[in-house]
Amino acid sequence: MSAIVDIIGREVLDSRGNPTVECDVLLESGVMGRAAVPSGASTGSREAIELRDGDKSRYLGKGVLKAVQNINIEIAESILGLDASEQAFLDRTLIDLDGTHNKARLGANATLAVSMAVARAAAEEAGLPLYRYFGGSGGMQLPVPMMNIVNGGAHANNSLDIQEFMVMPVGAENFRDALRCGAEIFHELKKILGAQGMPTTVGDEGGFAPNFKSNHGCLQTIMKAIEGAGYQAGEDVLLALDCAASEFYKDGKYHLAGEGLQLSSSEFSDYLGNLADQFPIVSIEDGMHESDWDGWADITKKLGKKIQLVGDDLFVTNTRILKEGIEKGIANSILIKINQIGTLTETFAAIEMAKRANYTAVISHRSGETEDSTIADIAVGTNAGQIKTGSLSRSDRIAKYNQLLRIEEDLGDVATYPGKSDFYNLKR
């Protein structure tokens, strides 16, 4: 039995210099698993609770010593001696121990750190790479990356209201060529921005954060970068947006402050539809406020057959909310963020539910990241098909891309790359 003999939680820093939780799980054999959890900036109101200390004398109140203490005392007492290979049982133990619907007592940052560290230890004990431990022999599909090359909204201090402008190298034959494509576009964009006298500083997720006058102007510049890098937009590369619309929704209107617009739900759907008509946009995330289900129904009716409509704040990786969305025909894709729900077992359940309903699943990082690359292994192990893990800069983002390169190398000839075919529920 892969018995857990020790568990250690600690406070470490994420990519924004804020505290987060790391956990080590030691097995009877001497094998250790280590994991660190991410943290978001734009968060859904129904996400599992990230436990912070609130002590303003430490890290401006953002310390996580309470969550760490919960690992080292209460969680340790409950899982020491358990079999690390029984992931579902261990995760259920954590859920029951917490006793709330949103991990508010122990903290999702505590439960997730333990859940991930247990999986890493069990994979090491079994002599398996993590992606193989997650997916068995069936995990062989590399994901199409959504590469965030321009940051706006809550991820950057600029005039862009839309939070992320991304490129998706769908025309590549394999993941390594897709990564090269994204990197070449990123560097071409840097050259173009510099020539226009715009800053080339980067935001939280590694994308540039220039002050474009409009979303349209930003997309035009990205199109130039794609062409300048030697690729054809619409064939080799498609575009994706993360509106994070909950961040600029107020009093029933969508306030695009950068463009001086105040739009109703229907008008904002049309605004996004017009952008999709002018540019090769294949995916729009959080195009409506998380509670604007009428707006979501409208945008799904208008765009859902040709555009991937991803629910992030809408679904928060929660099967109960996703089930309701599926029943009402809201969106056609879910963003998967492991810290939104707080255990691996619940994460995998959300991915499986989405697939059964013909929704796509996009595995995602958070804006506050660490060097932990577990989401890369999840993307391959579950054959998710897409991953969103930032730009082509900042080592906290590159760590995931590099892990995917290693996995592709490990898989060898059996590795597949879906490209456009991952948008199996669209008619384009």
From Swiss-Prot:
Pfam families: Enolase_C, Enolase_N. The keyword Lyase applies. (2R)-2-phosphoglycerate binds at Q163, K337, R366, S367, K388. SUPFAM superfamilies: Enolase C-terminal domain-like, Enolase N-terminal domain-like. It catalyses: (2R)-2-phosphoglycerate = phosphoenolpyruvate + H2O. One of its GO terms (molecular function) is phosphopyruvate hydratase activity. The active site is at E205, K337. Its EC number is 4.2.1.11. InterPro entries: Enolase, Enolase-like_C_sf, Enolase-like_N, Enolase_C, Enolase_CS, Enolase_N. It comes from the Bacteria. It is found in: Cytoplasm; Secreted; Cell surface. One of its GO terms (cellular component) is extracellular region. GO terms for biological process: glycolytic process. Keywords: Cytoplasm, Glycolysis, Lyase, Magnesium, Metal-binding, Secreted. Its cofactor is Mg(2+). It is an enzyme of class 4 (lyase). Pathway: Carbohydrate degradation; glycolysis; pyruvate from D-glyceraldehyde 3-phosphate: step 4/5. Mg(2+) binds at D242, E285, D312. Binds a second Mg(2+) ion via substrate during catalysis. Belongs to the enolase family. Catalyzes the reversible conversion of 2-phosphoglycerate (2-PG) into phosphoenolpyruvate (PEP). It is essential for the degradation of carbohydrates via glycolysis. This is Enolase. It comes from Polynucleobacter necessarius subsp. necessarius (strain STIR1). The gene is eno.
